[in-house]
């Protein structure tokens, strides 16, 4: 069985005793039974955390204090490297927690698919700082989204599977803009040139998107 690993796997810079940076990848994926840190040089798993059968981990991130944040369909957890649970936020029955990421201000962004779908920002203690409910207009939660992101304007970018589009949603839940793309967009990340890199899921490609004009640059 071929597993689909998270396309936006985190690249960690870990300093060794001789102060030389070595590259590691934090990996997770729908259908895999663990999340793991892999040494890119040796190709060996240096740390892993088991996942229960049926958990769908589509987002995983390292926090500034080196803890591990991940979504698992039924919720999102923050754990230590010693596998101790710091907090666990559950998704409502019938919903799917698909996003768990670290924001630039040190807080965390969580999002679950549902009717309505919900985006939350929480702090390191798991306290909810803000909550945004919005209607994707997609009936099946599993067909909605995977990795929501936040742009520099403070709005949320939601890549939608079923409708093949990227939507910009305000913190109040208002739809501000929508851009159509190829495939089933999985993740969207800002580039230095202000465009966005979009992982297009089953289209098996990445695109560079100018979200303001809707043009696919490449």
Describe the role of every protein-language-model region.
Residues 3, 7-22:
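Bacterial Sec-dependent signal peptides at the C-terminal "C-region" and cleavage site
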Residues 21-218:
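Secretory-pathway ectodomains
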Residues 1-5, 216-217:
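Short intrinsically disordered, low-complexity coil segments enriched in acidic
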